[in-house]
C-alpha cells in the first residue's frame, strides 16, 4: 500500500536499496511523446550517489532501461516501465542493524507495522527508492515544457545556518549546477561545501532547505477543497525521505504580516492579463494556480544514519549502542534538488491533464 502517486498521470515505484534494482511504472502518459533513455538519464545523473566529495561514496551508474511503453522513441500511451539495476551493493555493512534500530530512521516503525523489514540499507525506506520518481519526473517535465513551456528549478537555499541569497524569479539551471552543493549563491555555496565536509569527517550529518520555483504554470491548475494544488505539492515533496517541513509563498513568515501587508494586489499588464503586484501567495490562490511563479520550500532533516555512537535498542527490547556502518550522505540536500523538482513536476503534470480533461473539452 502507499506505492502509487497521482490520478491521471500515475506512478508506482518498486525495488529496494540493496536488492536487484529499483524503478517505476508510469500509467497515463499521453501517447506520441518523444522520449529517450538519454533524456531520463540526465535527471538520474543529478540524483545518483558518488557524484562528488560531499555525497555518499556508493558508486552507482544508475543507468536506466526503458522496459515497456516506448516504441521507436515515442510513448505508446501504455504503461511505461523504467528499471535501474543496483550494482554497488554491500548488504554486509548492515549486519549489525538487523537487530539494532537506527535512531530517527524507519527501522523501528517498519518493524512495528509489518513485523518484518529489509534491514539491508533500509529497503524501501532508502532514498534509493526516489530513482523511480526522478525518472518519471523527467517525463513529466517534458510534457510540461512541450504543452505549456513550464520550467521547474530547485536549488539548495540553506544548509544548517548558512543561507544563500537567491532570486527564484531569475535563477537559472546553469547557476544551480555551477557547484556541487547546488546553491546558486557561489560564495555561500563554497562555505556550505566546507561545512558538509567538516561534519562528514566527524561522522555526523546536517540538514537544510531546498527552494523550488515553477515558472509559466498555466492558470487554473488545481481542484477545490481536498485536491488543492499546494496540498498535492505538499504531499508529493513531504513523501520524500528526510523531508520534515513545507511552505509555499510567504509561508510561516506570512503570519507576521497584516492582511493589507500580505494581500497580492491585482493589476492588468501590457498583454491585458490579470497579474499580481506581489507574490506572497506563491502562485496559488484558493488551491488553484494564478499564473504567477509557484515558489515553495522543503525542509530536510540531517541524515539519520551516522557513524557517531548513539543509544538505541534491539528488536528484542534491549538497550544498546550503535555506530552505524555503510555509505551515507552527510547532507542529503544536494541530491534532494532533483527529487523535489521531480515531485513538483509529477503534481503539475497530473493536474495539467486533469484540467484539460475537465475544463478543455467543450
From Swiss-Prot:
Keyword annotations of the record:
Amino-acid biosynthesis, Aromatic amino acid biosynthesis, FAD, Flavoprotein, FMN, Lyase, NADP
Query: Any binding details for the cofactor?
Result: Reduced FMN (FMNH(2)).
UniProt keyword NADP present: yes
Q: Which Gene Ontology terms describe the biological processes this protein takes part in?
A: amino acid biosynthetic process; aromatic amino acid family biosynthetic process; chorismate biosynthetic process
Q: Gene Ontology terms, cellular component aspect?
A: cytosol
Top-level EC class as recorded in UniProt: lyase
Q: Could you tell me the EC number(s) of this protein?
A: 4.2.3.5
InterPro entries from the xrefs? Chorismate_synth, Chorismate_synth_AroC_sf, Chorismate_synthase_CS
Pathway it works in: Metabolic intermediate biosynthesis; chorismate biosynthesis; chorismate from D-erythrose 4-phosphate and phosphoenolpyruvate: step 7/7
Question: PANTHER family, per this entry?
Answer: CHORISMATE SYNTHASE
Q: Which family does it belong to?
A: Belongs to the chorismate synthase family.
Q: HAMAP family, from UniProt? A: Chorismate_synth
NCBIfam families per UniProt:
aroC, PRK05382.1
**Could you tell me what this protein is called?**
Chorismate synthase
By which gene is this protein encoded?
aroC
